[in-house]
């Protein structure tokens, strides 16, 4: 719930310090020290883009005892070098490694020295940064109307899971309406689709997917203003909100404003403990049929897969599998982060994840659905933060967007291949059908702490799965 610390990185500079040269020693003159400080600061702030910020263990960010003169500055630089953070001061033509970056299903080669000939990879930091900064960034806000009957006019220190989930769903809507290749235009007026999506995530009850409405929809799963919530409860809150929203709009004008079916995947094929969640093809087909009001045609579908991949920490056997999900063209990333600090994880390089951080406090803004000249800058971020994959909380949720039947079939094929690589411990599995099982737990036992145990009931009358069990894998 608190902000993840990090260090900014400038994308371009020819200064020797930016190339990782030694820091000035404690015997440097005052003039040399001043020049060194100016060099490194100009390196950091010389560009509108901050390429990377990295999360370090909290012990690395404890307040330092006061030091003066060149000793303190040298100590600061040595500490950066020792923690492996000096690369963050490199220029835009440099990257942490020559490894590929996978970002929401697209591959980028950030190294200027080793360009890939693969048609699956795009070269250059500029292309990656344009993609990253075009993603919808949703953060803490303050100054909005009080949430329901509470006195909360801000979600600071407790709303990060809600904000992370809003980011993931917003990307699904962007991909649906504007396509994966869409980038934020540099000129106004903006497209009605883009502005309409931002409007839906505004901070008022009038906005379909606001924090106000999500908390209301998730009450039965423990969502409440001022309280933190886990990924499973958050996914179920979205399921409830989307269903309620669709029913309301269909009653008013015959149309819903969520343009896809939503499938929260959980439980194993028999509803018993110990199995991986199952993507059931028949359930997905039924959800699409219901979305299309009984027609057999396939609809776009959003899949949310809540998981617990360990107890106190992420089980390392799942790391390669999590990394590979970012290579799926259907990837929407992960709701996850350090314990108690949810983020929106959207990419991976080597064993580090790249994420958008909701822990920045901004004033609430009202973007009208028809205001194509609106200032949308607070919904975009050009600072990439990274975190070691093995440090993320084992409670997380993975998202996928499938545009049509062919896209869903491709997703199922990739997921099945991932199962084959899992050595008996898959993230989730794919099956044609599942059998309903007996009720094992009461719905009242669920809570919003990310460790919910829910009923397994098969399909309900709406074609959606009942409240299924969510187990530690």
From Swiss-Prot:
MF (Gene Ontology): cysteine-type endopeptidase activity; protein-phosphatidylethanolamide deconjugating activity
InterPro entries, per the entry: Papain-like_cys_pep_sf, Peptidase_C54, Peptidase_C54_cat
Location in or out of the cell: Cytoplasm
Pfam families hit by this protein: Peptidase_C54
Enzyme Commission no: 3.4.22.-
Domain of life of the organism encoding this protein: Eukaryota
Gene Ontology cellular component list: cytoplasm
Reactions performed catalytically: [protein]-C-terminal L-amino acid-glycyl-phosphatidylethanolamide + H2O = [protein]-C-terminal L-amino acid-glycine + a 1,2-diacyl-sn-glycero-3-phosphoethanolamine
Enzyme class: hydrolase
Keyword Electron transport appears in the UniProt entry: no
Active site per UniProt: 160 (nucleophile), 357, 359
Keywords for the protein's UniProt record, in alphabetical order: Autophagy, Cytoplasm, Hydrolase, Protease, Protein transport, Thiol protease, Transport, Ubl conjugation pathway
Major localization listed first in the record, in broad terms: cytoplasm
Any one of the GO BP annotations: piecemeal microautophagy of the nucleus
Region Disordered, annotated ranges: 1-33
Family of this protein: Belongs to the peptidase C54 family.
Description of how the protein assembles with itself and partners: Interacts with ATG8.
Function field: Cysteine protease that plays a key role in autophagy by mediating both proteolytic activation and delipidation of ATG8 family proteins. The protease activity is required for proteolytic activation of ATG8 family proteins: cleaves the C-terminal amino acid of ATG8 proteins to reveal a C-terminal glycine. Exposure of the glycine at the C-terminus is essential for ATG8 proteins conjugation to phosphatidylethanolamine (PE) and insertion to membranes, which is necessary for autophagy. In addition to the protease activity, also mediates delipidation of PE-conjugated ATG8 proteins.
Protein name as catalogued: Cysteine protease ATG4A
Gene giving rise to this polypeptide: ATG4A
